[in-house]
């Protein structure tokens, strides 16, 4: 009842209300984005209506004149769903349904439906169900209005009150069960992070607005074959793959769910275990659709979510994707060294430079000469396996002189090995200097 999903092909009228001043539930994103969400959910938008108000109508959210207009549009289009690109109170939603004799769905409920449809893993399904239940708890009263009118005598409670309390208790118990299961999921993820820290494995996370091309970049870098479709929330469940970075070796690259303006808070809370992977990353790759009309607004939305999950202060590289869709020559505005760069997941443009930037931001130092004794063959092989060796020469005494480019952690581990010497450091002009680099 509370998780009713719109069937594929269901016809709907889309309503967006603009407000002249601040108002609860004001929708700041575009109508086109909400229509794209509807398309993703399989809903056919037959007509889009808009209204402008100073504040929401306390009963219907909109005025009665607009209410009659919507009713006529629903009848003319043979539609049985009103999709509202704003947030409604439980009472406003109930009153609209009673007045229009149709299902009314808010933007939040539409996003919850899409997430429920896309969740594939055990963890993802748990998180979506928890978000749905949290939302349902705020809407529960409207499901039992036909029983609320039944009154009890002195010392007795009406049937509606009893049924409502029973349903609230059932939802509350299920929420507690899901939260306990997700605590176990978070514990397992935490153990995985501890293992990676113990093994000194770096984590790089892709973040960004939904449909910015995160999964396409993930596939281009790792050949993982993750589903990458031109639609909102094509990726929901997080994916991890190893990515070789010169001088560091294998890092873990994670592909995460995309963000969107006014992402329901219940979803952010429910996906806490997943989003903690982002908050615990060593480096973020913030993917931006450079061809989008509202680039700055989308960047702000992503930054707001990152701040909410405690990841706003992490080192970040801005990746302006889909640069091939822009006029030739415009990519220069996005090229700001290791902090920002133009890329194209489709053509591969800029991905080689990206790997160098990742190495630099993760702390790869300037080239260092390492002297290995003849018997250190395993150490030599290990350095080659990490992709850290730039050049090699054999000394007269049989020792090996390797020009190595690696992070400080790897160099420290080398310096602690017997008979291994770290000599003066030269600079590779291909790698930008880092703060603290020796000349």
What are these regions (language model features)?
Residues 31-40, 71-76, 87-102, 246-250, ...:
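Conserved C-terminal guanine-recognition region of P-loop GTPase G domains, centered on the G4
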Residues 1-14, 134, 138-212, 218-219, ...:
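C-terminal-of-GTPase-core extension/linker across diverse P-loop GTPases
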Residues 109-128:
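Short alpha-helix plus adjacent loop in nuclease-associated cores
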Residues 1-112, 422-439:
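N-terminal accessory targeting/assembly segments
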Residues 18-22, 53-55, 87-90, 109-112, ...:
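Conserved nucleotide-binding/hydrolysis micro-motifs of P-loop NTPases
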Residues 2-4, 27-32, 55-72, 237-238, ...:
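Switch II of P-loop NTPase G domains
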Residues 189, 196-202, 220-251, 260-270, ...:
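Switch I (effector-binding) loop of TRAFAC-class P-loop GTPase G-domains
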Residues 14-18, 48-51, 83-85, 286-289, ...:
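Conserved beta-strand segments of the P-loop GTPase G domain that flank and frequently precede/overlap
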